[in-house]
Amino acid sequence: MKALTARQQQVYDLVRDHISQTGMPPTRAEIASQLGFRSPNAAEEHLKALARKGVIEIVSGASRGIRLLLEEEPEGLPLIGRVAAGEPLLAQEHIESHYQVDPMLFKPSADFLLRVNGMSMKDIGIMDGDLLAVHKTQDVHNGQVIVARIEDEVTVKRFKKVGSKIELHAENPEFSPIIVDLREQSFTVEGLAVGVIRNGEWL
């Protein structure tokens, strides 16, 4: 597929969204109106350009005769790898790749995958190298397994809040709890663990 110009991408997105919302393509007049073209003929010229680039087919003799040829693959869930200090967890530079996993397989639905580093949660089946499915939220409760950021370090632990302190418990007797004093340390909940994908068995 040849690259689309910014205006061609706008026209393509409008056609795609209109089909998704109404079940049918827009007319040339509707495209012109929504994108500020002077006339439906201008919309027609952009549609012809899209047809030449192979992303749509124009069906002659119909005002709504537009068929999409380019079916976009969903990106899937982003896989977060090593996280740089001071950067948001979902920053583009942290995303290693995307995996075609249905977010609705998890309850609540997953927003991203995090590669597990270490064996601190092995007793509940979260192993080194696993992909942890995470629902992005800051609304968590005692006893839940969460993804947290302490200062600039990201960790997966069982959450417990006691007064002004947070206790993050491992599921491995070899690891001591992490105690966070909210009055002195930076602490952020990045999300709730909602499932595990055993790395290597499904890829």
Curated annotation (Swiss-Prot):
It is an enzyme of class 3 (hydrolase). The record marks 85-86 as: Cleavage. The keyword Hydrolase applies. CDD domains: S24_LexA-like. The active site is at 120 (for autocatalytic cleavage activity), 157 (for autocatalytic cleavage activity). Residues 28-48 bind DNA. GO terms for biological process: DNA repair; DNA replication; negative regulation of DNA-templated transcription; proteolysis; SOS response. One of its GO terms (molecular function) is serine-type endopeptidase activity. Represses a number of genes involved in the response to DNA damage (SOS response), including recA and lexA. Binds to the 16 bp palindromic sequence 5'-CTGTATATATATACAG-3'. In the presence of single-stranded DNA, RecA interacts with LexA causing an autocatalytic cleavage which disrupts the DNA-binding part of LexA, leading to derepression of the SOS regulon and eventually DNA repair. Homodimer. This is LexA repressor. The gene is lexA.
